[in-house]
Amino acid sequence: MSIQTSDISKLFGKQRALDKVSISVNKGELIGFLGPNGAGKSTLMKIITGYLPADEGEFFINGDKIISGNLDYKKDIGYLPEHNPLYPDLYIKEYLEISAGFYGLKNVKKRVTEMIELTGLGIEQHKKIRALSKGYRQRVGLAQALIHDPSILILDEPTTGLDPNQLEEIRKLIREISREKTVILSSHIMQEVEAVCNRVIIINRGKIVADGGIAEVKSGNLGQKQIVIAEFKESVSKEQLLAIEGIEDVAILGNTWELEAGPETEIRPAVYAFAVANKLTLLTLMQKQQNLESVFHQLTQQQN
């Protein structure tokens, strides 16, 4: 199933939590929402899942406009909130059977058994939820979100508080689930989104500041500064490099220079021409591949 939002806005008093947010999520995508705390990630997820109404804008599932109050589409969405709402005095099977009952599923016991197997809860299935570790509680939350076989899975900070082993196990599980479903997960951990997702949407102060494939966002083609690495055999001064058209700032790291340019500026031909004109030996000239963390900081700090 596909999801589209058009100019979605949400206000809490005078605070504009979302400001004309438009996204398009295609069937089968695994997308990461990235943003600082309070950026609007959870608010957008709650609007998509029907837990919050938008104040402005439109929302579509498979091209059909969702009318406020019509929540029939929720049967196609599985949702794991940031604070996983479990009942600690219930056994795992009890909790999942009750969850399945809300959707009027047939063969409830069979479906619960399938979810326990899928989420790796087999060894813990006879325990009460209060006796489970954080990692296994997250698995129970995932099993609940998947119990009715939704087409879309929404995961809000699904790995918060997990240890490194639990973290990798949940990431692996999410990747497996995404083979058959559209998955949106939110995080403020860049490494997590980079490890799991194939597309990232960066949200800051209620606005979309980047949207693209992981490689595309890291390449510097979405509005952030570009960095070129240059190394000369001969000595070159900072002033000489700043005089090259398009270069906005420079920094020296050992024997190499980092040359900063605007997002739409290709400075490598100008640097090469500078080397030729000054009879310099150019040992290195390449675009610096940024990591997602540096792009994130650059985009969110620009907005702030």
Question: Predicted regions span which residues?
Answer:
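Short coil/loop linkers at secondary-structure junctions
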Residues: 106, 122, 247-248, 281
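ABC transporter nucleotide-binding domains
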Residues: 2-5, 10-204, 208-210
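C-terminal coupling/interaction segments
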Residues: 263-304
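Short beta->alpha junction loops/turns
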Residues: 66, 105, 233-234, 264, ...
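Positions that flank functional sites
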Residues: 115, 131, 256-257, 290
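ABC transporter nucleotide-binding domain
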Residues: 171-262
